[in-house]
């Protein structure tokens, strides 16, 4: 009788254990599937943003990029909806920052303004800040391109945005809650200082060339 009770109890345990085992297997299988989808979409967004940034540098057509920006923003919203497990939230960082960087470059180049955080309510606060830090390096590329074309007005316009972004970035010193904040501040400072030096040299050369041109005109009129 005692053995029979034990046997019945063991069978019941096995039934319960199998039910729980099936649940746990399904739970982890679903979690792994979500993780794979997040990683795939994250890589896709990052790749799209990198390609978009390269194209923005080379183009003067504002309307060319609107559809792609909207497409990427929808992908990010989908990515956000997938990150239902707390441990997956970290996967949002890179794609969100890359999007902020691409959108900021676009708006600075074509609209002469920086996107506000309120406009990007699907972007985490930390990623908005770090994305703006990254665009400083892209603005340096625009400064250098403007120098090649002797466009002093554009050089000064882009550099002013670089300064404004750096000042904005330096308002934050929450290094224990925002990963890479200090590193990006240091990188931004270095880019700003290097670009300032390049601009000083550019203006000096521009003035020298203008002076030589006036001298040549004067000599030709004698």
Swiss-Prot record:
One of its GO terms (molecular function) is sequence-specific DNA binding. GO terms for cellular component: cytoplasm. Disulfide bonds: none annotated. Pfam families: Translin. CDD domains: TRAX (cd14820). NCBIfam families: PRK14562.1-4 (NF011159). PANTHER family: TRANSLIN AND TRANSLIN ASSOCIATED PROTEIN X. This is Uncharacterized protein MJ0175. It comes from Methanocaldococcus jannaschii (strain ATCC 43067 / DSM 2661 / JAL-1 / JCM 10045 / NBRC 100440) (Methanococcus jannaschii). The lineage of its organism: Archaea, Methanobacteriati, Methanobacteriota, Methanomada group, Methanococci.
